[in-house]
Design a protein with these regions (language model features):
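Long, low-complexity, compositionally biased intrinsically disordered regions
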Residues: 1-107
Length: 107
């Protein structure tokens, strides 16, 4: 396993532990494969295009970096493995609950 997959930065931690709901095939992303809505605890909603690795949040748009919303979609759908150094008890219980993918834990 690559070293990058073993490390977890602050953005990864927030993506895994904060209350963020990933929705697919609902609202603005209905019938749009590869697109998701991520809703935060505050009610903010962001459109994610996983194929283009794009998010409409200010963090992604203005800082040109992979934001917690993009990472949350990747973890929730199983596109990215959750590193083994992450404590399962710290991960949001609802990770992957509202999308067809399944979160994957690295071994």
């Amino acid at each position: 396993m690559a070293a990058a997959e073993q490390s977890v930065d602050g953005v990864d931690r927030r993506a895994l532990t904060q209350y963020l709901t990933v929705l697919e095939d609902q609202g603005r992303v209905r019938d749009c494969p590869g697109q998701y809505l991520v809703v935060s605890q505050s009610g903010s909603e962001y459109l994610i295009d996983a194929r283009l690795e794009a998010c409409e949040c200010p963090d992604h748009e203005f800082r040109d970096r992979e934001c917690k919303h993009l990472k949350r979609v990747a973890y929730a759908t199983g596109q990215r493995e959750i590193p083994p150094i992450v404590d399962r008890g710290d991960v949001d219980d609802q990770l992957g609950e509202h999308c067809s993918g399944t979160p994957r834990w690295s071994r």
